Each structure stands twice: as C-alpha cells, then as structure tokens.
Amino acid sequence: WKKFAGLRALYGYTMAHPGKKLLFMGGEFGHFIEWKYDDQLDWFLLLYENHPQVQQCCKRLNEIYRTTPALYQIDDSWDGFQWIQANDSDNSIVAFLRTDKRGNSLLCVTNFTPVFHPQYRIGLPQMGTLTECFNTDRKEYGGSNQYNNWAIRTEEEQLQDFQYSCDICVPPLATVYFTSVSYTHLRAHET
C-alpha cells in the first residue's frame, strides 16, 4: 500500500507546488516501467485495483488544477506562495499556501511518512474556517479513508510565526488540500 500511497501523495504535492506540470505517459495510472517511445503502455495494469485508483486520483487532481486559479496564477513569484510548515523533519510533514490574484488561498499539507496524525497542529496567517476539498487518502483512490469531514475553525493560538492555528487530520503518506473562508468574509455575508 505504501508504494501507491506515496505516489498519490507525491502527485498531490507536485500539482499544488509552483511551476509547470509534467507527467510522463503512464504515470497517471502508476505504470511501473519507464516510458519507452517505441512501445505501448502496459494497459493491462488497469485490470488491477490500485492502478485505476491512481488514475482516478490523477483525474481529480487535473480537475482541481483547471478550476483552482491559486494553483496556476502568480506561479512565478512569492506573492502566490507561502510556506506554512517547512521545518517538521520529525514528522516529515510540509504545508504551504497557494494564493490567486483575488486573494483566495488553497492550503496543501503533505505527510511523507506512513504515520497517521489524527490531530496535527498547524499555524495559519489568518483567522477562518478550513474545509477539506481533496485528499489522496480517500477510499476511491485506494487510501485508508482518513479525512477531515467537518469544517475546522482556526483559533487565536500562536504557533511558530503565525498568530492562529488549528488541528487537522493528516493521513499517512497523503496530500490534503483545504480551502478557507476568513471570518471577515463570513461576517460580511451574515449581515
């Protein structure tokens, strides 16, 4: 399970990371053999359960990329990217924000170890509510189905360089995306 989970986590991390995307043919379904220009792909792999699940994960990642401007706008400057967690070598978890031209953000959290973190504390630059919008550990992608199925409110509790923080569920060998709504935005719609 670790091989496919690690691959899905890597694809999720790569899709959210700044820069243009490249995936050689066959990678979208977990092809084992390096790409060969003079031979066809091993399509029979799609008969096995794990390969179509990786394919579904890649399909969903492509849909998210096409419909989430934060993943492709401001792709060439620090204005569209902010490290949230880059120093947790004990847990091998990294997190960053991608922001579009309108200020909408997507939080990407990747766990590069097979250790489940049901309550991982993460610092954030603003007060708001996080909602999980993608998780490579979902059952339909071949994962263990550990996910955040509730809205997560940040608290005014400092963590590292951030004034706010919250606890999130971080599955093993997985990448999770969150969208956020700031409290000021929520208040504007409540009145």
Task: Mark where each language-model region is.
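Short Gly/Pro-enriched turn/cap motifs at secondary-structure boundaries
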Residues: 2-5, 14, 84-87, 166-168
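Glycan-recognition and catalytic regions of carbohydrate-active enzymes
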Residues: 9-10, 16-19, 23-26, 30-106
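Conserved small/polar residues in nucleotide/adenosyl-binding loops
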Residues: 184-191
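C-terminal beta-strand-rich structural cap/linker in extracellular carbohydrate-active enzymes
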Residues: 151-183
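Active-site rim elements
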Residues: 1-2, 42-52, 162-167
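C-terminal accessory region downstream of the catalytic core in glycan-modifying enzymes
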Residues: 41, 46-54, 61-63, 121-152
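Carbohydrate-binding surface patches
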Residues: 85-124, 174-179
